[in-house]
């Protein structure tokens, strides 16, 4: 998911997306531990997508704080 697509979402949608990514990362870790994972690159992609979502959430929070001040 691109950063621009994420910036168009609301903070609630971003939190939902982050929750889904964390669940997927959890499942991928279990698949790796049991040797069932097929696409190991997906772990990296999920981890980076989660970081991207967190970054944009922080940007939106900072923008809201600056708007209030």
Swiss-Prot record:
Gene3D superfamilies: 1.10.287.310. Keywords: Ribonucleoprotein, Ribosomal protein. GO terms for molecular function: structural constituent of ribosome. InterPro entries: Ribosomal_protein_uL29 (IPR050063), Ribosomal_uL29 (IPR001854), Ribosomal_uL29_sf (IPR036049). GO terms for biological process: translation. Belongs to the universal ribosomal protein uL29 family. This is Large ribosomal subunit protein uL29. Signal peptide: none annotated.
């Amino acid at each position: 998911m691109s950063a621009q697509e994420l910036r168009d979402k609301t903070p609630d949608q971003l939190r939902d997306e982050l929750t889904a990514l964390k669940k997927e990362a959890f499942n991928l870790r279990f698949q790796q531990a049991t040797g069932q994972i097929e696409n190991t690159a997906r772990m990296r992609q999920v981890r980076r997508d989660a970081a991207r979502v967190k970054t944009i959430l922080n940007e939106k929070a900072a923008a809201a704080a600056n708007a209030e001040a």
